[in-house]
Amino acid sequence: MARYNPKDTEPKWRAAWASANTFLTPITPDARPKYYVLEMFPYPSGRIHMGHVRNYAMGDVVARYKRAQGFNVLHPMGWDAFGMPAENAAMERGVHPKGWTYDNIAAMREQLKALGLSIDWSREFATCDPEYYGKQQAWFLHLLKRGLVYRKEASVNWDPVDMTVLANEQVIDGKGWRSGATVEKRKLTQWFLRITDYADALIDGLKTLDRWPEKVRIMQENWIGRSKGLRFTFKFDGEAPAGHADGLEVYTTRPDTLFGASFVGIAPEHPLAEQLAAADPAVAAFVAECRKGGTSEADIEGAEKLGRDTGLRVVHPLDPTLTLPVWIANFILMDYGTGAIFACPAHDQRDLDFARKYDLPVLPVVLPPGEDAATFQVGKEAYVGPGAIFNSEFLDGLDVEAAKTEAVNRIEAMDQGQGATVYRLRDWGVSRQRYWGCPIPVIHCEACGPVGVPEDQLPVVLPDDVAFDKPGNPLLRHPTWRHTTCPSCGGKAERETDTLDTFVDSSWYFARFTDPTAAEPISKAAADHWMPVDQYIGGVEHAVLHLLYARFITRALKDEGLVSVEEPFAGLFTQGMVTHEAYKNAAGEWVEPSDVVIAVEGATRSARHAATGEPITIGDIEKMSKSKKNVVAPEDIFEAYGVDAARLFVMSDSPPERDVQWTNSGVEGSWRFTHRVWNEFESQPAGDFAHDDSDAAAVALRKGAHRLIGFVTDSIEGFRFNSGVARLYEFLNMLKAAPAEGASQGVLAARAEALEILARLISPFTPHLAEEAWAHLGKAGMVVDAPWPKADAALAADDERVLPIQINGKRRGEIKVKAGTAEAEVEKIALADPAVLAHLEGLTVRKVIVVKDRIVNIVAG
């Protein structure tokens, strides 16, 4: 028997697919129904990792399956190629970002091709291609003309290491998401996209995304943060500070708690705080200290509450006899509401923590159910639940929601404010102070101001002759590139030296894939045919970054007439990570898995260094990362076990939405499976064999094969790949139990049918093995072009039925019978069942009602 050798087989079939242009999807679509499957395109770091293998293998299963079902499948690949790592490489290694990036793309392209992915490589592009980013500049100018792009001075998150601005979403625990540096607050003139214009549409559109994970929809809804509340003004007690004669405007979502107010707080970046800081060094020092903290809402939420009393007081709008102190507080966000709040410590935890620290009053105004108004007090935790309002004059006795409405009505009647809807979402700051990004197509003229570059002068191409001998943006230091003439007046002018956030690049690439050769940014005809993406696959870490921005840009481009859809991704699947144990030596240094030998004695596992023999500490199972050296190189796995074994393992070990722990024993199991499958094909004799319906073993095998079709189909449709693989394992055991050697004609015929079905079913998972098996069977063409098998309904039908047994209307047991068993026989089996006999003890059976293949009802007394 010939042994299966993936080193020979896999390259052979990849070459055959390439030679036949098997996965080429013509720009002009055909009559087949379309199916667009896309995995989030990778950053070209230079090497793929096992997370890539899992992500792209999943997408490939879907693409191959849909192709076999008769769909015209679009399955493209590209590169999210701009960004800081290329500039870091330039500074650290003395290479140019462009060369470094394209070299990495070339290397990763070959690695991805080695995976046997059914990708249409003719549509490949990188976001750093001038052809691509020139089209991006074109639609950016459209949005600029429409007013969706604007420029203003703003307080921004500044990464002092990368020397660039970060969006709020890119600040993780107060640090830059790439550099890890502590982020600072600075004021810079920046370019923004008006994503807030689409806030309601983005929230409401989530209701249509029923094929998205609920957790992602919730994350986006919370990030946009639509809230209804009250915007109103506190008048200053006494003389108002200069420029604030109208008072201090605040926003609240809890107007029902107005009578519980104990102070008013303003953000350190609030204009009043900055005005006071300019006149008082102590206030200035406090404001500066606040700016050193984390910038995200989560960071501010978790930080120690700090404040400074300004000495100012304001008059309560509903009780003129009451004045409240004005504090500068580090937990108040300038970019939410008005940057000023009234604080009710009894019913807000942040306010309570602050009030306890600075000995400010805590007055409860919402009485929890069952509590006594005369004795209720707030302890360490604020009460944020439902209840009746008290200590609140005209609001007393109302529930929380009714009190909110009444408080808003009263403030509006007094002409001191009005009900308002506010969002946590801020406009998207897209300026980045770096070289390796899409140039913003704007020219600055002293006479004309910012002027868009004429479209016939696009793309604005990055200069190659730049130096990376110091941090910051080399475009600012370029001797010629930035100097140009104004398109409007012809006078001297300068190019914008900021480049676009890389999330702009990935906010529309899926639309460009529909026709990457189009002269316009997006071919309307191609986009109308292919969009939306039917199945998008990627990590949940992009829920409020890439996915939200892509939804926004798609809607903006629809309003420009470039696309017809509002939502870019009809279906979204977020896969889990690939994890591995992490190892350390005695010096606390991380050790690569390839250098570790594991020994198992009973339930105890120990590790030593393969070369030195020194003991190794086995650490936690964590996401594979270069920093912890717990990375397994895909190319090493491909060399040792074959590509198909690696593909199979990452889909078989756990549900795809969960993390999968990489183990050598696991991939070895997948390797053994591929060889066992091949052995079954190899052992099958050639020839035509007649089916024999009287041969029980043959019929059982045929039934198993046709049921397998349904199981695997359902597993792919439901993204339960591991379940489908498990069924394939089970069926292989069934095949082995009916060996070809010495088999009857009926069993050989059943085996031949089952093997043909098996070759088609494993094709999405192990495509190289499937092709070799298909060829071994002598089938015409390639299995990739074969249709998905259809189950024979009669053979796939379950022979057994589980019938519940009810005695006097209560379920007391169940029996298994063959489908179609006569009623008299079912009654006999039911009355002989031990559980039924136990419940009938002492009773007389008066009537038995059998609903064929459904249920047995026994009446007894």
UniProtKB/Swiss-Prot annotation:
Its main location: cytoplasm. One of its GO terms (cellular component) is cytosol. A motif ('KMSKS' region) lies at residues 623-627. InterPro entries: aa-tRNA-synth_I_CS, aa-tRNA-synth_Ia, Leu-tRNA-ligase, Leu_tRNA-synth_edit, M/V/L/I-tRNA-synth_anticd-bd, Methionyl/Leucyl_tRNA_Synth, Rossmann-like_a/b/a_fold, tRNAsynth_Ia_anticodon-bd. It catalyses: tRNA(Leu) + L-leucine + ATP = L-leucyl-tRNA(Leu) + AMP + diphosphate. Pfam families: Anticodon_1 (PF08264), tRNA-synt_1 (PF00133), tRNA-synt_1_2 (PF13603), tRNA-synt_1g (PF09334). A motif ('HIGH' region) lies at residues 42-52. Its EC number is 6.1.1.4. GO terms for molecular function: aminoacyl-tRNA deacylase activity; ATP binding; leucine-tRNA ligase activity. GO terms for biological process: leucyl-tRNA aminoacylation. ATP binds at residue 626. It is found in: Cytoplasm. Keywords: Aminoacyl-tRNA synthetase, ATP-binding, Cytoplasm, Ligase, Nucleotide-binding, Protein biosynthesis. Belongs to the class-I aminoacyl-tRNA synthetase family. NCBIfam families: leuS_bact. This is Leucine--tRNA ligase. It comes from Caulobacter sp. (strain K31). The lineage of its organism: Bacteria, Pseudomonadati, Pseudomonadota, Alphaproteobacteria, Caulobacterales.
